[in-house]
Amino acid sequence: MSANELTSGDFTESGEPFKLFAEWLKEAEASEPNDPNAVALATVDEDGLPNVRMVLLKGFDDDGFVFYTNFESQKGREILGQRKAAMCFHWKSLRRQVRLRGPVEIVSDAEADAYFKTRARGSRIGAWASKQSRPLESRFALEKAVAEYTARYALGEIPRPAHWSGFRIRPTSIEFWKDQAFRLHDRIEFRRPSPVGAWEKVRMYP
């Protein structure tokens, strides 16, 4: 089945970007070989130099797109400094792409705590042991830190580190791209002046 056959109707007629994203993600979950929620996250440092890396989307709704990270990591520091970010989803099996960008807010402690509890125990230990984005003298040093925190939290719940939480991108732009023959692709961008503004839909040249 081709990507064009998967979605009923013409996606360019949609006026609801979050609903359209939900439909596309659901189809990606059925067709991508792994991690359909993987997304390229772009941030910029204090000199305006961009950095990009893959993260996993952990939730989305009409308020925005959520992912979790160490706030002392490179991306954490850059987002806290600029409070803006961009994402790009690419589903090769569907020949589709979604780009979005906008201001970023920190999720509530309750949201972060609830998600942290769902993580594998080893991942929760790792959140304590890893000084993310800092130089590491050896693999042994990391394994030693993991062993120390494993012993410290051998019994009971593992608390969420204060430096580990989530960010929510509240998009002011969401673009849906779909491959078409001869590079005459379909591109639809939804724009709004602020995260609470009304959406304007614009068809873009490919």
UniProtKB/Swiss-Prot annotation:
Positions with a binding annotation for substrate: 58, 115, 119, 123, 183-185
EC number: 1.4.3.5
InterPro entries named among the record's database cross-references: Pyridox_Oxase, Pyridox_Oxase_N, Pyridoxamine_oxidase_dimer_C, Split_barrel_FMN-bd
Organism: Rhizobium etli (strain CIAT 652)
PANTHER family: PYRIDOXINE-5'-PHOSPHATE OXIDASE, PYRIDOXINE-5-PHOSPHATE OXIDASE
Pathway noted in the entry: Cofactor metabolism; pyridoxal 5'-phosphate salvage; pyridoxal 5'-phosphate from pyridoxamine 5'-phosphate: step 1/1; Cofactor metabolism; pyridoxal 5'-phosphate salvage; pyridoxal 5'-phosphate from pyridoxine 5'-phosphate: step 1/1
GO annotation terms (biological process): pyridoxine biosynthetic process
Organism classification: Bacteria, Pseudomonadati, Pseudomonadota, Alphaproteobacteria, Hyphomicrobiales
Name the record gives this protein: Pyridoxine/pyridoxamine 5'-phosphate oxidase
Homology family: Belongs to the pyridoxamine 5'-phosphate oxidase family.
Keywords: Flavoprotein, FMN, Oxidoreductase, Pyridoxine biosynthesis
